[in-house]
Amino acid sequence: MSEKTIFAEKLEGFVKSLKDHVSSSDGQWTVKGFIDIFKNVYTISSDTKIVSKILEIHLFPKILKFAQDNGYKVVLAEHQNYYPDISFVKAADESVRFAVDFKTTYRNPIKPYLCNGFTLGSHGEYFENRASTKNIQFPYGSYSGHFCLGIIYDRADGATIDETKSHNIAELQAITSVAKNFQFFVTEKWKIASDKGGSGNTANIGSINNIADILAGRGMFSKLGEHWFDEYWMNYKKI
């Protein structure tokens, strides 16, 4: 088996353990908020960026252990806008690297078979020029594979969350979590890419948003292969 196949299989096995790490028995996120020295608990916002960052912090000890158990070093992105979030570098052969990006999104409450979607990194300089070091930890072409570690969840009903209220730590169990019903997945990013750009004005690759297709890796390029994904996005809106 190739290094990429071995890494992918181990990462897939690891991801199956993460739901229990972040969830209570009823599916609620075990993170309830943040605490001050007076033991007051403040509810966190349901803003996706905040939830995503706290989930990363929550999962990081597990990520580190996974890397150590499998002979990899973890290199974090040096800057906030760098790709990827985590580079796994093989300790015995540092030329073997895998890019892993955290992707967090929530289910559509009206159409729960859909999620809000997410971006899959830039199709700009470092994607077009695979030797470039602009906004990327290592050159894109030096990675043996590019993976998404994805998290899909339900947002709590806004009526049950009061961000203006603080709680005593004794009330911890009664605080409604801002997220619940987590679903974790891992896939190579090209397998869940769409043919449309991500949100905003940045040059980002957009994902598909059907949850079943995301979990099965059935994106726009899944039958064509990674080469066609690369060709399409390297030439996006240029032809």
State each model region's role.
Residues M1-A77, N81, A91-F98, T104-I239:
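Nucleic-acid endonuclease domains
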Residues P84-D85:
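Internal alpha-helical scaffold/solenoid segments in large eukaryotic proteins
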